[in-house]
Curated annotation (Swiss-Prot):
InterPro entries: IsoCit/isopropylmalate_DH_CS, IsoPropMal-DH-like_dom, Isopropylmalate_DH. The gene is LEU2. The record marks 146, 198 as: Important for catalysis. PANTHER family: 3-ISOPROPYLMALATE DEHYDROGENASE (PTHR42979:SF1). This is 3-isopropylmalate dehydrogenase. It catalyses: (2R,3S)-3-isopropylmalate + NAD(+) = 4-methyl-2-oxopentanoate + CO2 + NADH. GO terms for cellular component: cytosol. Keywords: Amino-acid biosynthesis, Branched-chain amino acid biosynthesis, Cytoplasm, Leucine biosynthesis, Magnesium, Manganese, Metal-binding, NAD, Oxidoreductase. One of its GO terms (molecular function) is magnesium ion binding. Its cofactor is Mg(2+); Mn(2+). It is found in: Cytoplasm. NAD(+) binds at residues 82-93, 295-306. Substrate binds at residues 100, 110, 139, 231. Pathway: Amino-acid biosynthesis; L-leucine biosynthesis; L-leucine from 3-methyl-2-oxobutanoate: step 3/4.
Length: 373
């Protein structure tokens, strides 16, 4: 059996980014050594992004990092940002926005579920309210107001005006709808689709709604889609989150907000992975960028950050970009086993360190894979 090499660009970023990415690499190396399903080698290419890149090169995304990403099978990112770099002309977050745009990462996939039912008690909502929550937010990532025209005008100190433009095309909405439909069809029976917009006041949302309806009815007639105003959906997500189980599709800004709201339901940002894709993962080889939902946590002491979100992001990378579906399933099972054993960082009311959690997951996934041999 020939060895299959997969190239992964590693962008640790700032603060805890290095720690969490190191744990994910450790787990991936264990999978490489133990998997009985195929001979595989992960070739890691390390580069800078964010504040670390600004300090070293003067820009938040150096050309060599972008070029490496373009020539890789996937990108694994830690986290960017921190108070050191403030909100000036050069900001760490600009590196993330640029790489999304340059790599055409148009779809952000964020699940909201419980990696283990033993975590239900950690949710800020009552366990009986959140039990069974299982939704996937598909956010359009390279269009809308974040990439529209904008301007700040100052005629005088007392007279200032600023505006941002929300703009969507039929093509942009069509491709994100197809992504949501593909995700829905990966389940038996297919998952329902919820489309969130503000069609009662925004022209862009009315185009969004019309396009979603057209794509689903013409291309995916077996799927169901329901429309919900974003403000109403935000309330439902807290009152009765399981009502929104399935696939949620929404625009860039609305997706940014609703996915952050959803991320607190499981009790910790340290649990939730994120994938940003440039194409449908219909052959499990879509190019993607994978990162945790949380930020760089500059105030957190060393070896205290929860690495699970990044490790689960690596599991998503295995499944969607690296054609290692069985390895991804083994890794997700390993995470569940470790959580059920109570090996947890402080954000999950545990006492384990970052490296201890990573080591436990390495041990668990190695055992699972060797049992399959």
């Amino acid at each position: 059996m020939s060895v299959k090499t997969k190239t992964i660009t590693i962008l640790p970023g700032d603060h805890v980014g290095t720690e969490i990415v190191n744990e994910a690499i450790k787990v991936l190396e264990a999978i490489e050594a133990a998997t009985p399903y195929q001979k595989i080698h992960f070739d890691f290419k390390h580069h800078l992004i964010g504040g670390a890149a600004i300090d070293a090169t003067g820009v938040p995304l150096p050309d060599d990092a972008l070029e490496s990403a373009k020539n890789s099978d996937a990108v694994l990112l830690g986290a960017v940002g921190g108070p050191k770099w403030g909100t000036g002309a050069l900001r760490p977050e600009q590196g993330l926005l640029k790489i999304r745009k340059e790599l055409n990462l148009y779809a952000n996939i964020r699940p909201c579920n419980f990696a283990s039912d033993s975590l239900l008690e950690l949710s800020p909502l009552r366990p009986e309210v959140v039990k069974g929550t299982n939704l996937i937010i598909v956010r359009e990532l390279v269009g809308g107001i974040y990439f529209g025209d904008r301007e700040e005008q100052e005629e005088s100190a007392d007279k200032q005006t600023a505006w941002d433009t929300e703009k969507y095309t039929v093509d942009e909405v069509t491709r994100i709808t197809r992504m949501a439909a593909f995700m829905a069809l990966q389940h038996t029976p297919p998952l329902p689709i919820w489309s969130l917009d503000k069609a009662n006041v925004l022209a862009s949302s009315r185009l969004w709604r019309r396009t979603v309806d057209k794509v689903i009815s013409e291309e995916f007639p077996t799927l169901s889609v329901q429309h919900q105003l974003i403000d109403s959906a935000a309330m439902i997500l807290i009152q009765n989150p399981t009502k929104l189980n399935g696939i949620i599709i929404t625009s860039n800004m609305f997706g940014d907000i609703i996915s952050d709201e959803a991320s607190v339901i499981p009790g910790s940002l340290g649990l939730l992975p994120s994938a940003s894709l440039a194409s449908l993962p219909d052959t499990n080889t879509a190019f993607g960028l994978y990162e945790p939902c949380h930020g760089s946590a500059p105030d957190l002491p060393a070896n205290k950050v929860n690495p699970i979100a990044t490790i689960l992001s690596a599991a998503s990378m295995l499944r969607l970009s690296l054609d290692c579906v069985k390895e991804a399933e083994a890794l997700e099972e390993a995470v569940k086993q470790v959580l059920d054993k109570g090996i947890r960082t402080a954000d999950l009311r545990g006492t384990s360190s970052t490296t201890e959690v990573g080591d436990a997951i390495v041990e668990a996934v190695t055992k699972i894979l060797k049992e399959k041999a």
